[in-house]
Amino acid sequence: MRFTETKATTRRGWTALLAAACLFATLVAIAAPGDADSAPLRVVVLGQTSETPPASCPGKIVNNVEITPCRVEGHVTGFQSIADGVPRPFEAPFEGKIVAWSITLAKPSTKETKTTTDEVSFFDEFLGTPAQARIGILRPVEGSKPPKYTLVRQSPTEVLNPYFGSTPVFALDHPLTVLKGQVVALTIPTWAPMFALNLSPENSWRGSRLPEHCISKEDIQGGHPQQGVGKTKTYGCYYSEARLLYTATLVKKP
């Protein structure tokens, strides 16, 4: 096993939420068909691409040798800089509300067998338990090098273990306001198996670690995700050929 560097709703609940949004948009369009200022509800899924790569976990053991390690991320806040060739996929293109977010989770092994190790227990011991995640809204600090971001708001933390092997969607009871140009980041207080490695160079992400403290086990374990609202943090690590598997749904009322 290696490192790489609200209220949960069911899929039915999220489908209903989107259906309600679409219905609202339709009613607005019908109510004022001649109004030049009227416009349909805008819904954008930040981070969504035509294909989602599988998470790099669980690992595989052959003849007691770890051939393919389970890859996870932990103790970090990060966001995708490029996803499948799309630049700045988590930068808000307009002011609106983040109403939900999703995360694609692998199913790490929980038992010692001839082909697997107890990955969950390993990561629990090394990074903390349970597996957790939340999203945050970051405001870039202009002119900062390496780049710095200020956390302006964040969602509640979600426990991920019950959702291993699936892609849960978490609808927010209190949607998060995001301004144009701000970034929706993923925060991992402990660890999460939502990481895809060995992708094309058209995938890269930036993490909240200091330069030269990006890849060792000590760097990962000693990392601190950005969870203090109003605080500013340096995002000094840039990881290529990898992807954080999450999305955020941005809505703008007409």
Model-identified regions with their sequence ranges:
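N-terminal secretory signal peptides that target proteins for export/translocation
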Residues: M1-R12
